[in-house]
Amino acid sequence: MNKLAIYLFLLLILSNCGFDNKQLEDQNVNSKIIFEKSKIIKKELNSNLKIKLNKLTKGEVFLGNNTNSTGNINFETNFKKTSSYKFSSIDEFDFNQPELIFTNDESLVFFDGDGSIFKVNKELKEIWKVNYYTKKEKKLKPIIYLAQSDKKIIAADNLSRINLINLKDGSLIKSIENNTGFNSNIKVFKERFFIVDFDNIIRCYSTKDGSELWNFITENPFIKSKKKLSLIIKGELVFFINSIGDLTALNINNGSLYWQTPTQSNLIYQDAFTLENSDLVF
């Protein structure tokens, strides 16, 4: 009797299992895929599309424009004549986003992977090339941010130094040391320039003698972000976004706070090193 009961019990369980599987099969037949896994597009989109740009802006000069990160570019779309200039490669070029500068004497200034700064003319012929780093510093592969102020080149690096360099011959005018490196573009306004360092401090320096005129401290995360920050000037205000996404507007003359607002959630504070900020543009 006990064996018969056990047999019937097992038969009942197996029958139920079979019924459940039948239900699952019916459900699978009637099911529909709502979300599909995205596929990587390997083909170039709009490969035949051609855009001719005569002028990017109207009424705004290119040199010294402070209303966006890199300035406005007026150019002709005739590439029949090309030139090249070879220099040692820069580590993590796309990540660091280094930018060359156009000077008011119709030349270009940039740097190479060893920290050498060079000036070339319109035909990319070298005018001068200098390097003011020690052998040990060269191995660190400094990233340099450049700007022009009158007859000076301002060269700030991610090692903690700002060099003021003579535009004509590349000679060193003055070297300024900071407590930490810099990681933003440089903006020049009248006789001062502005830059942000790794501690989320915006600093204002004199273009005449390199003295610090004022600074403004914003919230500083424990983990330092190496991503380049954005800095612009509009009217009498300087705007910058720090590594945790806070957008700040300051009085350009004395650094007093005009307003400040976060652009990210509070959770971003813990993940500041993964935050990728956009460039500021007016």
Locate each region found by the language model.
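Short loop/turn segments that connect beta-strands within beta-propeller blades
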Residues: N121-K125, N166-G170, S206-G210, N251-G255
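Sec-dependent signal peptide recognition
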Residues: N2-L11
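Blade/loop signatures of beta-propeller domains
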Residues: Q27-K43, S47-S83
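Structural signature of WD-repeat beta-propellers
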Residues: N66, N104, D112-G113, D150, ...
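Bacterial lipoprotein signal-peptidase II cleavage site
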Residues: G18-E25
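C-terminal motif of bacterial Sec signal peptides marking the signal peptidase cleavage site
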Residues: I13-N16
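Extracytoplasmic beta-rich repeat domains
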Residues: N21, E44, G59, K81-F102, ...
